[in-house]
Amino acid sequence: MTLSVRERIVRAVLQRVTAAVAPVPVIRPPTVPVSREAGVAVLLTLDGDSIDAHSNAVVDRSLRIRLTAVAQGSEAFDQVDNALVLAHAALMQSPNLDGLSLGIREFEADWDTDDLDAGSLALPARYEIRYRTLSADLTQMG
């Protein structure tokens, strides 16, 4: 089975972020919730995929992803900040994901942490990844 360009991009992002933040787990939902005992984790979620332009048989697309670092405890601020710093550096090291995309840019970051509950923090950062496919075949780059 041939994977879509979008899925190949998501897997490349997952691989880069996982290598950068190891041994912190990177989780792509749907999956089981992060346990309180896990300490820190990074969640990779897809916020959307939109069509930006059509040109003959080529479609320009924008995939929006969210990386959310979550942690519990007294070191939570340092842990989530460090996880996102490492993940960001890994993504920006090769913004075209070794030829899979046209580029990646930070779309939004919420450096004001969200309180999940007492002692828990979530720090999200969003990225936009531009890429091209053929209009008739989502598995082929345009």
Model-derived segments and spans:
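Charged, amphipathic alpha-helical segments and their flanking helix caps
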Residues: 1-34, 47-142
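Charged, often glycine-rich, active-site loop that binds/positions anionic groups
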Residues: 37-47
